Swiss-Prot record:
Protein name from the UniProt record: Cytochrome b
Membrane-crossing segments per the record: 33-53, 77-98, 113-133, 178-198, 226-246, 288-308, 320-340, 347-367
GO molecular function: metal ion binding; ubiquinol-cytochrome-c reductase activity
Oligomeric and partner information: The cytochrome bc1 complex contains 11 subunits: 3 respiratory subunits (MT-CYB, CYC1 and UQCRFS1), 2 core proteins (UQCRC1 and UQCRC2) and 6 low-molecular weight proteins (UQCRH/QCR6, UQCRB/QCR7, UQCRQ/QCR8, UQCR10/QCR9, UQCR11/QCR10 and a cleavage product of UQCRFS1). This cytochrome bc1 complex then forms a dimer.
Note, other: Heme 1 (or BL or b562) is low-potential and absorbs at about 562 nm, and heme 2 (or BH or b566) is high-potential and absorbs at about 566 nm.
Job of this protein: Component of the ubiquinol-cytochrome c reductase complex (complex III or cytochrome b-c1 complex) that is part of the mitochondrial respiratory chain. The b-c1 complex mediates electron transfer from ubiquinol to cytochrome c. Contributes to the generation of a proton gradient across the mitochondrial membrane that is then used for ATP synthesis.
Cofactor mode of binding and number, as noted: Binds 2 heme b groups non-covalently.
UniProt-annotated binding residues for a ubiquinone: 201
Location (main, coarse): mitochondrion
Length: 379
């Protein structure tokens, strides 16, 4: 008799995706982040659901409802901080997952990669709208500044912004719709993640060498299930250390002040995971130019398969490209630091140089390094 997991219509899907899936025998811990992102998403949906039970999306009560969650709801404080810091863990995993894809040439799986880029945009949109919900100073002014960027779009810009706001400023209508979108988007992300996985399983996983592993496959369970459980335990450990010992470490103190349209905070800045893009935005003196650079800083990922000039897929055996990759990582860390600094000398020029370096590395230096390595192979 055949095992039920191989015959049952529903269990068959689970079996082919998580149990009997043929996986390369040599994938490293950098391949753990997909499952960790899945865990982050489930955690965010669950904590978010319980927060939504007590939250009110009205400008007069939003701030106090969050205070009520933290003070009066049973374990409300831990749910709130797990949700806020869970977002940070989500983005740490996201950046490492994308970085892994860049390093090992996983972007040659075109559909998987492009769905992944859409997932990144959707997650960033969700996180931005979630940051607005507590209705603190940084929530209000962050929403005002970022939505205002759309006014840079020629001809329709101003109308578009007022349409998104639901009025002539960020107000009750804006908060209510942001809550609605913040609630629905994670489910859209879940659906996209399933599509992401569907496309991945059409080709099978990449591996550190970038060479086909069809001749050397092992079942996903128990080898990678146990490996993923270890990763999950480390993720939860890191999250709980953050939640229980330093819950406000990554937040902004300004968000503990209720939103006040008459008082602008001295430094308006987004959460840490958007700072690199924010630094690129600020480094261009022109509004439309800044907005385009901001969008392109992420959208440039779509071009990665076109910019791949190397004869090898992975960077494992390409020392010059490795060097370029780690310079790019250092550049992104520099941009993240600059994004959190005030707009004054020397931060302005550092930000501008780091922004130029970012696009130069991806569009020119990395493809050039690959071409040089191709020629060195002939020697």
């Amino acid at each position: 008799m055949t095992n039920i997991r191989k015959t049952h219509p529903l269990m068959k899907i689970v079996n082919n995706a998580f149990i009997d899936l043929p996986a390369p025998s040599n994938i490293s811990s950098w391949w753990n982040f997909g499952s960790l992102l899945g865990i982050c998403l489930i955690l965010q949906i669950l904590t978010g659901l319980f927060l939504a039970m007590h939250y009110t999306s009205d400008t007069t009560t939003a701030f106090s409802s969050v205070t009520h969650i933290c003070r009066d709801v049973n374990y409300g404080w831990i749910i709130r901080y797990m949700h806020a810091n869970g977002a940070s863990m989500f983005f740490i995993c996201l950046f490492l997952h994308v970085g892994r894809g860049l390093y090992y040439g996983s972007y040659t799986f075109l559909e998987t990669w492009n769905v992944g880029v859409i997932l990144l945009f959707a997650t960033m949109a969700t996180a931005f709208m979630g940051y607005v919900l507590p209705w603190g100073q940084m929530s209000f002014w962050g929403a005002t500044v970022i939505t205002n960027l759309l006014s840079a779009i020629p001809y329709i810009g101003t109308n578009l912004v007022e349409w998104i706001w639901g009025g002539f400023s960020v107000d009750k209508a804006t908060l209510t719709r942001f809550f609605a979108f913040h609630f629905i988007l994670p489910f859209i992300i879940t659906a996209l993640a399933m599509v992401h996985l569907l496309f991945l399983h059409e080709t099978g996983s990449n591996n550190p060498t970038g060479i086909s592993s069809d001749t050397d496959k092992i079942p996903f369970h128990p080898y990678y299930t146990i490996k993923d459980i270890l990763g999950a335990l480390l993720l939860i450990l890191a999250l709980m250390l953050l939640v229980l010992f330093a819950p406000d470490l990554l937040g902004d103190p300004d968000n503990y002040t209720p939103a006040n349209p008459l008082n602008t905070p001295p430094h308006i800045k987004p959460e840490w995971y958007f700072l690199f893009a924010y630094a690129i935005l600020r480094s261009i003196p022109n509004k439309l130019g800044g907005v385009l650079a901001l969008v392109l800083s992420i959208l440039i990922l779509v071009l990665m398969p076109l910019l791949h000039t190397s004869k090898q897929r992975s960077m494992m055996f390409r020392p010059i490209s490795q060097c370029m990759f780690w310079i790019l990582v250092a550049d992104l860390l520099t941009l993240t630091w600059i994004g959190g600094q005030p707009v004054e000398h020397p931060y302005i020029i550092i930000g501008q140089l780091a922004s130029i370096m970012y696009f130069l590395l991806i569009l020119v230096l990395m493809p050039a390094a690959s071409t040089i390595e191709n020629n060195l192979l002939k020697w």
